[in-house]
Design a protein with these regions (language model features):
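Proline/glycine-rich low-complexity loops and linkers
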Residues: 1-70, 222-224
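Short beta-strand segments
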Residues: 19, 26, 39, 48-50, ...
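Structural motif
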Residues: 22-24, 43-46, 79, 104-107, ...
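Short alpha-helical segments enriched in small residues
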Residues: 128-318
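Accessory alpha-helical/coil subdomains and C-terminal extensions
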Residues: 39-40, 47-113, 118-120, 128-133
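Generic secondary-structure signature for well-ordered alpha-helical cores
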Residues: 2-6, 23, 41, 60, ...
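Short acidic-glycine loop/turn motifs at beta-strand connectors
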Residues: 40-42, 112, 123-124, 270-274
Length: 318
């Protein structure tokens, strides 16, 4: 701490004090409080720091290997991510598979506008776990395969990043109601400079006209929340940036705005072959509407790349 110009307080010293005997210190490169494993009489107590960004890597890098050495078996999991089909619909579609589960087990989770299935096998090795999991995964894919976008737990923006990189396509984004959220998620992926050209937040009608070339007559006739406006936004950002794909969003995120239209969002995807706009109607508060719009836009991007056969990646590696 002194090398960083911080005083070492009594509290900091207390954080690094552990019993002298039967104690394994777990290093914490992300904080000042190490963890420890105390062993006695064939039992172990494991202590880790509370902040998740410190605890989670310590658990994965230090605790899991320790537990694996002490156990004759291990747990191996695969995570399936599903978009476009709700948790209850997914559960109904695979009910007989879930009812028949023993090893591996299936655990469904709902998150925002998507559903996650975690398949976990009790096994002696990772290879054995994969062999147990594969038939269950195949049975699930047979039921809801068209809605699966990842079988390795990758999030939607990570999948889109993999597809963009593999296809060699470049993207630019024009956002209104999502306010830069799509761009933010895409460029959170390392190496995004290879395929992300630019992002523009064009919230006002004036900025849509000035920055993207949206026509005044389009806004007058159809309003700023319309398929027509979304298409001109997507075309504008693609042409001005030189990208292969332009994505746009415009909508009513709420809670104020057009009565009865809160949650209405238009998303457009522009390529040199043409531009298509899609309407989605989302429920929930402002945050949920915006999150849903981002996921829908990324899903349309994912489908666009796959449909053009510009990439040889399939669901089994994503």
């Amino acid at each position: 701490m002194s090398s960083r110009g911080y005083p070492c307080t009594p509290n900091n010293i207390k954080q690094v004090m552990f019993p002298a005997d039967h104690c394994i210190i777990l290093p914490n490169p992300r904080g000042t409080a190490p963890g420890c494993i105390m062993e006695k009489n064939g039992k172990a107590a494991i202590l880790m720091p509370g902040p998740p960004w410190e605890m989670e890597p310590m658990f994965e890098e230090e605790v899991v290997p320790y537990l694996q050495k002490r156990s004759n078996c291990m747990f191996h999991s695969r995570t399936i991510r599903i978009f476009g089909k709700g948790e209850s619909q997914v559960e109904y579609a695979i009910k007989d598979i879930v009812d028949a589960q023993s090893n591996p087990t299936i655990a469904p989770y709902a998150k925002a506008a998507e559903t996650t299935l975690r398949i976990t096998a009790r096994c002696g090795s990772e290879e054995e776990g994969e062999k147990l999991i594969q038939p269950v995964m195949q049975a699930i894919e047979d039921r809801v395969g068209e809605f699966i976008y990842s079988t390795h737990g990758r999030e939607m923006h990570e999948v889109c990043a993999e597809l963009l990189k593999a296809s060699g396509l470049k993207i630019a984004v024009a956002e209104s109601c999502t306010g830069g959220m799509i761009a933010s998620r895409l460029i959170s992926v390392p190496g995004s400079s290879e395929w992300f050209m630019e992002g523009a937040v064009t919230y006002s009608c004036d900025s849509k006209m000035r920055r993207l070339g949206v026509k005044a007559e389009t806004l007058e006739k159809y309003t700023d929340v319309s398929a027509e406006t979304a298409k001109e936004m997507a075309d504008g950002i693609r042409l001005q940036s030189g990208a292969d794909i332009g994505i746009s969003t415009t909508g009513y995120a709420g809670p104020t705005g057009a009565p009865g239209l809160i949650g209405q969002v238009f998303i457009a995807v522009s390529t040199e072959e043409g531009c298509n706009a899609y309407e989605v109607n989302l429920k929930g508060n402002r945050e949920r509407v915006r999150d849903g719009a981002v996921l829908n836009a990324l899903n349309l991007l994912r489908k666009q790349i796959i449909a053009k056969n510009r990439c040889n990646l399939d669901i089994n590696v994503l």
